[in-house]
């Protein structure tokens, strides 16, 4: 029996009571699509008053559900939803509680149902005076036929819609480990047959929120060690572009130098996300800049 929900929105939240209201209000802005959307708020052991903030929404809207679990980081929330088979929508997306959708984004996405994934562009909020429009892929709106082009560094969960079937096929994620959204995205790309790219802004990603994985210092051993592990897996997934771009982040490179560590990869990274001329130039430049810190068989 088909689900009555077109969409499921999973909202992982940890100590984000001051942001989650904006995330929920953005779902109300989906107008007629809001009531066709299942909303799953999963409180990952917050120590703030998140439950009180969302209580009015739970009373007013029957399509919004709230769950509490012990803290296990982002990946544990996705595992929790899958294990308990909570997500019922035809398409499933993850909205971090400090991000939000733009008005009528779901209406735009629904026009392209039928693909394994539908992926949109989004805005990156930096501060009150600066917002950047991020386009995950090169090219125009349409089906992406070359799946190597999907190995984008923009693997944030924002504006990515997984078919229900694909979502439940994905590997379980590691708990208590940063950057599991990268693995979720690239795992999905390994499995998809059809991906539609909507080159329109659908949402806003709050990249600079204090305390998130992006702004946490690279001196944090949990973040640093997690990223070393993630880079190994990105290479196995063929996402060499991710390896080089993030290795070049000043804080990460500084820690590699400080710890005198070398990333040993099983093969040379690929840069297939880029157009061929750029891939050649970028690959050569990055290989030179990281030659002391990334090694692979000749």
Curated annotation (Swiss-Prot):
InterPro entries in UniProt: Glyco_trans_2-like (IPR001173), Nucleotide-diphossugar_trans (IPR029044)
Enzyme class, broadest EC rank: transferase
Record has Glycosyltransferase as a keyword: yes
Keywords, comma-separated and alphabetical: Glycosyltransferase, Transferase
Enzyme Commission numbers on file: 2.4.-.-
GO molecular function, one term: hexosyltransferase activity
Gene Ontology annotations of biological process type: biosynthetic process
Pfam families xref list: Glycos_transf_2
PANTHER family linked: GLYCOSYLTRANSFERASE, UDP-GLCNAC:BETAGAL BETA-1,3-N-ACETYLGLUCOSAMINYLTRANSFERASE-LIKE PROTEIN 1
Family according to the record: Belongs to the glycosyltransferase 2 family.
Protein known as: Uncharacterized glycosyltransferase MG025
Organism expressing this protein natively: Mycoplasma genitalium (strain ATCC 33530 / DSM 19775 / NCTC 10195 / G37)
């Amino acid at each position: 029996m088909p689900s009555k929900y077109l969409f499921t929105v999973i909202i992982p939240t940890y100590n984000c009571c001051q942001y989650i209201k904006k995330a929920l209000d953005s779902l109300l802005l989906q107008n007629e699509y809001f009531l066709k959307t299942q909303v799953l708020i999963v409180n990952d052991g917050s120590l703030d008053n998140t439950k009180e903030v969302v209580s009015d929404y739970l009373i007013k809207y029957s399509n919004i559900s709230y769950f509490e679990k012990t803290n296990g980081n982002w990946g544990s929330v996705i595992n929790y939803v899958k294990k308990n088979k909570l997500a019922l929508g035809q398409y499933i997306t993850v909205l971090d509680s400090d991000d939000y959708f733009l008005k009528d984004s779901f209406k735009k996405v629904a026009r392209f149902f039928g693909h394994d994934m539908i992926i949109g562009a989004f805005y990156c909020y930096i501060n009150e005076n600066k917002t950047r429009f991020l386009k995950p892929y090169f090219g125009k709106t349409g089906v992406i036929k070359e799946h190597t082009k999907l190995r984008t560094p923009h693997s944030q969960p924002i504006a990515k819609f997984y078919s229900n079937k694909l979502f439940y096929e994905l590997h379980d994620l590691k708990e208590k480990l940063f950057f599991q959204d990268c693995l979720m995205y690239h795992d999905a790309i390994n499995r998809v047959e059809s991906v539609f790219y909507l080159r329109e802004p659908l949402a806003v990603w709050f990249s600079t929120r204090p305390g998130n994985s992006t702004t946490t210092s690279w001196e944090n051993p949990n973040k640093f060690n997690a990223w070393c592990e993630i880079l190994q897996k990105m290479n196995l997934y063929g996402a060499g572009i991710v390896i080089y771009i993030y290795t070049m982040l000043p804080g990460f490179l500084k820690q590699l130098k400080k710890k005198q560590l070398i990333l040993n990869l099983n093969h040379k990274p690929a840069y297939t996300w880029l157009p061929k001329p750029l891939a050649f130039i970028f690959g050569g430049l990055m290989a030179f800049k990281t030659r002391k810190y990334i090694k692979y068989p000749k």
